[in-house]
A protein has these predicted regions:
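Redox-cofactor-proximal catalytic regions of oxidoreductases
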Residues: 75-156, 424
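A glycine-rich dinucleotide-binding beta-alpha-beta segment and adjacent secondary-structure elements
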Residues: 204-207, 245, 417-425, 429, ...
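Conserved redox-cofactor binding core of oxidoreductases
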Residues: 133-239, 492
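Extreme N-terminal leader/targeting segments of oxidoreductases
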Residues: 1-27, 45-51, 561, 565-584
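FAD cofactor-binding and catalytic pocket of flavoenzymes
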Residues: 93, 131, 298-443, 496, ...
């Protein structure tokens, strides 16, 4: 449904009618993920005189609570592509890596797994991070974001079956699974501090297809209403394609407004300042496309792409109940599996006394309700690699139980004895973004090239560790089929990073420590910023949205200080060639 349809149905909407837009703003924020929502909220709320006019543009549609797809047909119908530009879920397939992300007001916060976690301090000591951006510097901004997003652990985390299953491997290596801080509401039943109605989490497990309960603390529940209540204008279904630097100062945005799946119109808007926060795929694409139209940029733009070391695997049909079947709004019946809890609740960190590049984080996952039946059928066919002998009869019975069409949520089925894992590690962040030029699209389409990405040794080590998890649960091991079964070593990531990395100067980064975009001569473009995951110059080994939030909180604060008279420092144009050689 489009914004117009939702308004006709009487739903409260954050977005404004497109016809009410102005022609010129002080600030235009492109994208409504953690970067765009936070920047707009902080700037709109700041005590500034005169108060700047702020416009936030989002290419996707608005998804009020209760409108998220929860059946496999509606989930598949909400895939974003050329014929469905307002779809919620986007799966981008490149030669070496595929990317899973969301599209809508609130960005990927609508469909992520909620985990708010701070990386190791050593991550920021990598040579590709600016020396002024350390974990200690960012800690106050982490705290600021965590407070607004209301991050905290599940109150019964250690009682959940999937967390106890994580512990079966953890104790073998002398550690334990620990509850993660997640941005999920477990207490508020009514209006939250930002005036938005919420309900407590029901443990339904549908976080990554969209929370229809209203318990997930997406940006739709906090930063976006903060921005709107403070005067920012929000427009959805509005895709920015490229930006133009105006001769007299300021910027012109070129894009298309999508009225529905079949109707769109081109538009331009002008602004003194533009904040690109369209994500690690789209912000670099906008800048690269703008370069084609004459914008001078750093030679580093389009480099440093990382999948955050993401990797997936399964321990299928083991000896213990795991309760990983999502229910959505369905009510569990007597004798059925217990609801799983949020998509991710716990983790095991492999960080003790090992080099940074060998550290990994393993997290539990659940199956959202729309995928339960398909997962049962698919994994029964794959079966996987048996890790222990003597349990074949019990496994056959559990697989048979899963084929019961009248009782899809049987607690004694194979899928409810399965663990689904997300792992994050340190990849080499050497992906590059380029443009192909098909005949039907004059500016081309962006591609990501990263030869040998999936053949990095860390992914083989992760695969072996997940096999050990499966053995600890007396399960069959199923690796990521794209990586293992077809032997392509193709990666899949839900956490794209880089492409417009932070750097000390224009030869080491595409933007400076405050997200100001470098020109090709070493200066910064006045009034052009990036605030999203594309700034992150390395893998983090943990879920990245809290780091993106902290970087944006810092960038927004510094921008407000500049508006109050505390000028930005001059960019460093004195580049050490020896430093460049050392980093090559």
């Amino acid at each position: 449904m489009t914004a117009t349809t939702l308004r006709k149905e009487g739903l409260n909407m954050l977005g404004s009618d497109w016809g009410n837009r102005k022609k010129t703003y002080d600030y235009i924020t492109v994208g409504s993920g953690y970067g765009g929502a936070i920047f707009a909220a902080r700037l709109a709320s700041a005590k500034l005189a005169p108060k700047p006019s702020i416009c936030l543009l989002e290419r996707g549609r608005e998804w009020p609570v209760g409108t998220f797809p929860d059946r496999i047909d509606t989930v598949l119908g909400a895939q974003r592509n050329d014929t469905n530009p307002l779809g919620l879920y986007e799966f981008l397939n490149y030669k070496d890596i595929s990317v899973i992300k969301g599209s809508g007001l609130g960005g990927t916060s609508l469909v992520n797994a909620n985990v708010a976690i701070i990386p190791d301090a050593e991550v920021f000591q990598k040579t590709n991070w600016p020396r002024t951006v350390t974990r200690d510097v960012l800690l106050p901004y982490y705290a600021r974001a965590r407070q607004i997003l209301a991050a905290g652990p599940h109150p019964r985390a250690m009682q959940l079956a999937k967390v106890q299953a994580m512990d079966r491997r953890a104790v073998e290596i002398g550690t334990q699974a620990y509850p993660l801080n997640i941005v999920v509401n477990f207490g508020v039943d009514g209006k939250n501090p930002h005036g938005v109605e919420q309900k407590p989490c029901t443990d339904c497990g549908d976080c990554v297809t969209g929370c229809n309960v209203g318990a997930k603390n997406t940006l739709y529940m906090n930063y976006l209403p903060i921005a709107q209540n403070a005067g920012a204008e929000i427009y959805t279904q509005t895709k920015v394609e490229w930006i133009e630097k105006l001769a007299g100062g300021g910027w012109r945005i070129h894009g298309r407004h999508v009225a529905d799946d079949l109707t769109s119109e081109s538009f331009t808007l002008d602004a003194k300042n533009v904040v690109l926060s369209a994500g690690a795929i789209n912000s670099p694409e906008i800048l690269l496309r703008s370069e084609m139209h004459g914008l001078s940029v750093s030679p580093v733009l389009g480099t440093g792409f990382s999948g955050n070391g993401d990797f997936f695997g399964l321990a299928y049909n083991g000896a213990w109940v795991t309760n990983v079947l999502g229910y959505g709004l369905k009510t569990p019946q007597a004798g059925e599996a217990i609801p799983p809890g949020p998509t991710i609740v716990s983790a095991i960190s492999y960080n003790g006394n090992v080099p940074l590049e060998d550290r990994i984080t393993v997290e539990d996952l659940s199956f959202p309700s729309a995928y339960v039946l398909g997962a049962k059928a698919g994994f029964a066919l794959l079966r996987g690699e048996d890790t222990v002998a003597g349990n074949e009869a019990a496994q056959r019975q559990r697989t048979l139980n899963d084929s019961d069409p009248l009782h899809p949520y049987r607690a004694d089925g194979a899928l409810n004895h399965t663990m689904f894992y997300l792992v994050m590690a340190h990849d080499d962040a050497r992906g590059t973004m380029t443009f192909d030029a098909p005949w039907y699209e004059s500016d081309g389409r962006m591609n990501i090239e990263w030869d040998g990405a999936g053949r990095e040794i860390i992914f083989t080590r992760i695969n072996e560790e997940l096999r050990r998890h499966a053995r600890a649960l007396q399960s069959n091991f199923i690796a990521n089929p794209l990586w293992d079964i077809f032997k392509t070593r193709h990666l899949v990531t839900a956490h794209p990073l880089g492409g417009c990395p932070l750097g000390e100067d224009y030869l080491h980064g595409a933007a400076d420590e405050f997200g100001r975009v470098f020109s090709g001569d070493g200066s910064v473009h006045e009034g052009l910023f990036v605030c999203d995951g594309s700034l992150v110059p390395s893998a983090l080994n943990v879920n990245p949205f809290l780091t993106i939030s902290a970087l944006t909180e810092r960038t927004a604060e510094r921008n407000i200080q500049a508006l109050q008279g505390n000028a930005y420092p001059q960019p460093n144009k004195s580049v050490s060639l020896s430093t460049i050689d050392a980093m090559a």
